[in-house]
Amino acid sequence: MKTLVALALVLAAPMTLAVDNMKAFPPAEEGMARYVIHVPEQADEAAWRVELQIGKTVQTDAANRYFFGGTLETETIEGWGFDRHILRQLGPMAGTLMAVDPSVPRVDRFITLGGDPRLLRYNSRLPLVVYVPEGVEVRYRFWRADDKIATAERG
């Protein structure tokens, strides 16, 4: 019985920690939404990154490349030392200007913020918390460094 109780405490501890950590993150302000990402534990978390993809699903032509303007800011929460990521405003959509056949139907596409990918540190002990305007989606995927390291040639 003691073993069962000890096992239950060990399994519940990370969940309790995650709930306690959420106290640091204020609820979303009016007109904003808060997204919370809990990532699974990995053996070597230093080799992993989380890529945020922030955007909206819109109807566009299939030929051009589109993106939204906007700046994802990172703020450290005073007194806690945790980071939160905030997109205060989704800017206008822009894209390439290739001519397309007007008779071709438009397609639904997820259009993201322009610029470099938003790669964040992987940490299974803390949630990734992202604040965005209402109507904006937050998607993510994982990146992992290869175990093989190549040596560059001098030249």
Model-derived segments and their meaning:
Residues L7, R34, F82, R125-L128:
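Short, surface-exposed beta-edge/turn micro-motifs
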Residues R121-G155:
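C-terminal partner/receptor-binding element of secreted or periplasmic proteins
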Residues L17-D61:
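N-terminal export/targeting and maturation segments
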Residues E29-G31, D44-A46, G79, Y122-S124, ...:
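Solvent-exposed loop and beta-edge segments used for protein-protein assembly and interaction
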Residues A46-G115:
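Mature extracytoplasmic domains of secretory-pathway proteins
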Residues M1-L4:
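Positively charged n-region of N-terminal signal peptides that target proteins for export
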